[in-house]
Amino acid sequence: MNQPIYLIGARGCGKTTTGEALARALAYGFADTDRWLREHTQMTVAEVVEKEGWPGFRARESEALQAVTAPATVVATGGGMVLRDENREFMRAHGVVIYLNVPVEVLAQRLEAFPEAGQRPTLTGKPVTEEIADVLAVRDALYRECAHHVIDAADAPAVIVSRIIDALQVAHAS
């Protein structure tokens, strides 16, 4: 198997950290759509949103997804990548989609411990835990609809990588 592997999930679920570790374990390349966007626009996510609005950012996010997709590549996507139908369809058609599922409380702890100042504007203006709960209430169904595999990602990256590899091997064997 050398299809791209797309990691989806909420902000703070570990897509980049887990993605880098998974890419090393599989000897795959690694790409991050947010990083690609920053490098190609020379703006942070917050700056893109301020300048172009959320619709402009979402369009650029779709462009990034298509640009980084390549065989034998792990792709960490932005948390809102699943909001556009075409992105969900593209990922499912071109690779294996893994939803890194993490409870709201764990996401809140991670985001409070490692704030991404200037990286990602608040979506609702609410406190972190409340915002995450609101966002997941909308997006969880989209993550699940898009994913080939749902992985419990509340543990250390090495444990999560092991779970993903197990899921990929089981799927490949069947």
Curated annotation (Swiss-Prot):
Entry keyword Cytoplasm: yes
Disulfide bonds: none
Pfam families given in the database record: SKI
Keyword Transmembrane helix belongs to the record: no
Sequence positions that bind substrate: 34, 58, 79, 139
Assigned EC number: 2.7.1.71
Cofactor(s) needed for function: Mg(2+)
Protein name, per record: Shikimate kinase 2
UniProt source species: Cronobacter sakazakii (strain ATCC BAA-894)
Gene that encodes it: aroL
